[in-house]
């Protein structure tokens, strides 16, 4: 029952843990397919100022990160609704309950796609979260874990919000990505 390392969203407030930054993960705005913003491909952060966002319940780091984005944008939390997981948030958006922020890796294949949700990227400096690998500073495995963390560092293209959605805001299909890769090309970005 011992944990040697973990991959977590920063900030992590524990001086006994070594943190090795892996990547910056952009957020996307997820809206129901018939929402007034659904036709948009991009928006600026301040355009969220009149929106109420669905958030996770207390205790999730993603909730804290989304609240920070809400504060920066002048948006609010949608009262009366709190999700227990990312999948619940996705289902709430698909059911037209509201809009939310989703991390890019939570919507990229192989995650199941939903035709009821449109994904909108942010123009300019997109809101994001920092992901790090952490382990005990006193760990005898520190040299190995440092090398392992280097393997977890993701290429920027993988985290590109453009590649998370097709041109119409619908999540990119796994087929399009695989077809491009099989021809030795990077998947097309829009």
Residues covered by each model-derived region:
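A late-sequence structural motif
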Residues: 33, 39, 117-161
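Short secondary-structure boundary segments
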Residues: 10-11, 33, 103-106, 131
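Secondary-structure junction motif
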Residues: 9, 52-73, 141-150, 155-166
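A local structural motif
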Residues: 72-80
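Hydrophobic residues within well-ordered alpha-helices
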Residues: 1, 48, 66, 91-97, ...
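Short helix-initiation/N-cap motifs at beta->coil->alpha
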Residues: 82-89
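Flexible hinge/capping segments at coil-to-helix
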Residues: 14-27, 31-53, 145
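Short beta-strand-centered segments that line the small-molecule binding cleft or hinge
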Residues: 1-31, 68, 94, 116-120
């Amino acid at each position: 029952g011992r944990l040697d390392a973990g991959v977590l969203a920063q900030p992590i407030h524990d001086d006994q843990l070594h943190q090795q930054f892996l990547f910056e993960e952009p957020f996307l705005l997820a809206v129901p397919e018939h929402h007034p913003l659904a036709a948009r491909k991009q928006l600026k952060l301040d355009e969220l100022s009149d929106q109420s966002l669905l958030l996770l319940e207390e205790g999730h780091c993603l909730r804290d990160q989304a609240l920070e984005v809400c504060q920066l944008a002048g948006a609010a939390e949608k009262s009366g609704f709190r999700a227990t997981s990312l999948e619940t948030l996705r289902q709430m958006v698909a059911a037209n309950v509201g809009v939310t922020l989703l991390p890019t890796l939570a919507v990229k294949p192989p995650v199941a796609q939903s035709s009821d949700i449109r994904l909108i990227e942010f123009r300019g400096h997109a809101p994001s979260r920092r992901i790090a690998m952490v382990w005990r500073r006193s760990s005898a495995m520190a040299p190995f874990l440092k090398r392992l963390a280097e393997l977890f560092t993701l290429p920027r293209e993988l985290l590109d919000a453009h590649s998370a959605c097709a041109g119409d805001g619908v999540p990119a299909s796994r087929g399009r990505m695989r077809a491009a890769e099989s021809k030795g090309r990077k998947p097309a970005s829009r």
